[in-house]
């Protein structure tokens, strides 16, 4: 059976393949094979560039081009050849080594140097660099731009509705008014910090042999400064070097990335749940598409499916990222292999996040403010002005200010007339009374509008 979106087991490669395809160059089996091949070639080139290793001569132009072409021209057909070697070896990294040994026979200079492919390496030297590069590129090329798009769309909504007054709800009950714009930009302000941390996080990598001590390196070439050579090699690939490891790089960097992703996703979970609630309250309507159906039985339905989809996928993503952060930082003694199968699922976690991000962006595009619903809620909850009145009373030392307003408003249905009658009885300056008399739930929004306009 040919794998298609219809018969794929995972919805990542099935139903949602159009949303996740952008991650395929970084997290597919082909991608892992490609990055392993690249690391093996770059390591060989570093040996050739070290004049204290005479057995690997400096590469001539033909050899350099040959190696460069192996990387740039690598395709699925070549990857299948590596998979054929793996059928013999039952070892994926060794299969890459054998593939390169076979390829080196095609170049006059390189065929005499096949012994230096995978020289002094353990598989984890190759793998940890490959995974680090995959994560780094996926974040830079796919995840960060998509997060930035969401932040931009929420900011735009916030700016558009900067002065649209809204009844707040704390504990689900009416509270001090705000503006819709202010509540939206709050989420962007929260996202800025983890987004910046995700951009700056360094994923460490090791290249120090079977148990982290350069044992084989030193046995073969004791005169080479392997610590310096390997550190330079790792940093030349744009990664930070971890000099103190066991056989594996301890994955603390991947754990850090995972925890940052969880924080980003939790903020977006909070956002999707709030938007869902605002839609439920009628504060937002959703643009309809004529051909779409909201319910198989209720023709009138326009459901907030994009935000619900995002909520579900963010939860799936977080479950995996939390597992990565907890699991990958633990390995028995100098290593066990239980991290290997977990690492192969890195792309799954990022994919669920990406599906969710696309759903949030799609949902945002459908939102239309319903000012009449917002105004109706405000006009029915004049009791929220009790805070303003008792605070002004305190300024002028009116006795028992809080208690007076509590007695007047707590659990009561209050309208404008009730409040104005109460204000007239106060022993505060007439100017202060006049200001309170002008106050309405719709105008009692503090600096909310200014905060949105100042936000960037």
From Swiss-Prot:
| One Pfam family in the UniProt entry | Lyase_1
This protein's UniProt keywords: Lyase, Purine biosynthesis
Q: What is its EC number?
A: 4.3.2.2
Chain residues that bind N(6)-(1,2-dicarboxyethyl)-AMP: 15-16, 90-92, 122-123, 247, 296, 301-303, 309, 335, 340-344
What processes in GO biological process is this protein linked to?
'de novo' AMP biosynthetic process; 'de novo' IMP biosynthetic process
Q: Which cysteines are joined by disulfide bonds?
A: none
Q: Where is the active site?
A: 171 (proton donor/acceptor), 295 (proton donor/acceptor)
**Region forming the signal peptide:** none
List, alphabetically, the InterPro entries matched: Fumarase/histidase_N, Fumarate_lyase_CS, Fumarate_lyase_fam, Fumarate_lyase_N, L-Aspartase-like, Pur_lyase, PurB_bact, PurB_C
Q: Does the keyword Lyase apply?
A: yes
Q: In which pathway does it act?
A: Purine metabolism; AMP biosynthesis via de novo pathway; AMP from IMP: step 2/2; Purine metabolism; IMP biosynthesis via de novo pathway; 5-amino-1-(5-phospho-D-ribosyl)imidazole-4-carboxamide from 5-amino-1-(5-phospho-D-ribosyl)imidazole-4-carboxylate: step 2/2
Q: Does the keyword NAD apply?
A: no
EC class, as a word, reads lyase
Please give the CDD domains that the UniProt record associates with this protein. Answer: PurB (cd01598)
Q: Which reaction does it catalyse?
A: N(6)-(1,2-dicarboxyethyl)-AMP = fumarate + AMP; (2S)-2-[5-amino-1-(5-phospho-beta-D-ribosyl)imidazole-4-carboxamido]succinate = 5-amino-1-(5-phospho-beta-D-ribosyl)imidazole-4-carboxamide + fumarate
- Matching NCBIfam families: PRK09285.1, purB
Its biological function?
A: Catalyzes two reactions in de novo purine nucleotide biosynthesis. Catalyzes the breakdown of 5-aminoimidazole- (N-succinylocarboxamide) ribotide (SAICAR or 2-[5-amino-1-(5-phospho-beta-D-ribosyl)imidazole-4-carboxamido]succinate) to 5-aminoimidazole-4-carboxamide ribotide (AICAR or 5-amino-1-(5-phospho-beta-D-ribosyl)imidazole-4-carboxamide) and fumarate, and of adenylosuccinate (ADS or N(6)-(1,2-dicarboxyethyl)-AMP) to adenosine monophosphate (AMP) and fumarate.
Describe its assembly. Answer: Homotetramer. Residues from neighboring subunits contribute catalytic and substrate-binding residues to each active site.
What family does the database annotate? Belongs to the lyase 1 family. Adenylosuccinate lyase subfamily.
What protein does this entry describe? Adenylosuccinate lyase
Q: Which organism is it from?
A: Legionella pneumophila (strain Corby)
Q: What is the lineage of its organism?
A: Bacteria, Pseudomonadati, Pseudomonadota, Gammaproteobacteria, Legionellales
Gene name as annotated: purB
